[in-house]
């Protein structure tokens, strides 16, 4: 049996995926501009000239620093439009923010994608809608609102358990548990975790499980100490959370019943740290 909730069943040639993107899209954060790289790049630029040439960008960074200083993980997110920035200012914002640990996509009902990238300052996100090249914005929050909305609006509240195929072992009680927990979950309730790495599930079990709860609209990847892939399923409040080692082998494969998994969320301490770091950057390079 292959370990991994979204691995293909035995004999299949391709992994299960609902998204029209390649693996390179989920791996985009590899080789991206890190916090150290962003600061090193800024250090080569003339701060006075930057402040004169990019007043809108500097003003935006100051507003973001003030906003994130008061942000809380459970509070509504705050949006900042980028439409008034010229090309130089847009590049400056990109250089300052860089690309952080969490990235992903949300599949929208019209078939397009929303691309999400956390900055090197945790809790500051860049969101781009594929349908409109100019519809790009920054968002301060635990996770972009579009992720929470898609998880709630583009999934099913309930599901039916069909006829279990021959060769199934444990899938029926697992599905019953998932259904019960998903229907009962409410914000504030602790997430429940089902660990497939230790659970005896046959390939038939896993295939039937995948077919029953289906893929959902959200793919997120977190690259901190190792890699974690977070996928929404087609059922509200049910997520696949997989951890990989350096060889890209799954070492922990779970289903999580609850809100957006915490591995993809910015926490209160992240906002505090990012506010302090951003203010230091502004003082050092734009004053």
UniProtKB/Swiss-Prot annotation:
Q: Where, by residue number, does the polypeptide cross the bilayer?
A: none
Q: Which family does it belong to?
A: Belongs to the HupH/HyaF family.
Q: What is this protein called?
A: Hydrogenase expression/formation protein HupH
Q: Which Gene3D superfamilies match?
A: HupH hydrogenase expression protein, C-terminal domain
| Top-level division of the source organism's lineage | Bacteria
Q: Which InterPro entries match?
A: HupH_C_sf, HupH_Hydgase_express_prot_C
